[in-house]
Amino acid sequence: MKKLLIVSVKAYQKYISPLSPPSCRYKPTCSAYMLTAIEKHGTKGILMGIARILRCHPFVDSGVDPVPEDFSLMRNKNTSKNAEKA
């Protein structure tokens, strides 16, 4: 199942994403975040990726938002604040 999810995201990155201009407000991009989340957390990573996509809109601050080590649907705010100070 994990491999199928990874292949699906990579297919999106290769064939669908290039059809529109870059618009992700975060680093890494939402699709790269989803890949990392699936690799780290298995199928739970899908939920993390979906939560990330739902946070990607103009009413939320942009910036660095890496996949947390522990499963969480919330933004990794500590890392984001530390990155802004650096």
UniProtKB/Swiss-Prot annotation:
Q: Does the keyword Cell membrane apply?
A: yes
Q: Does the keyword Cell membrane apply?
A: yes
Q: Could you state one GO cellular component term attached to this entry?
A: plasma membrane
User: What InterPro entries does its record include?
Assistant: Membr_insert_effic_factor_YidD
State one Pfam family annotation: YidD
Keywords per UniProt: Cell membrane, Membrane
The protein's location, in the record's own words, is: Cell membrane
Task: State the membrane topology.
Answer: Peripheral membrane protein
* Its job: Could be involved in insertion of integral membrane proteins into the membrane.
- Return the similarity comment: Belongs to the UPF0161 family.
In terms of HAMAP family, this protein maps to:
UPF0161_YidD (MF_00386)
Q: What is this protein called?
A: Putative membrane protein insertion efficiency factor
Species in which this protein is naturally found:
Streptococcus pyogenes serotype M5 (strain Manfredo)
For this protein's source organism, the top of the classification is: Bacteria, Bacillati, Bacillota, Bacilli, Lactobacillales
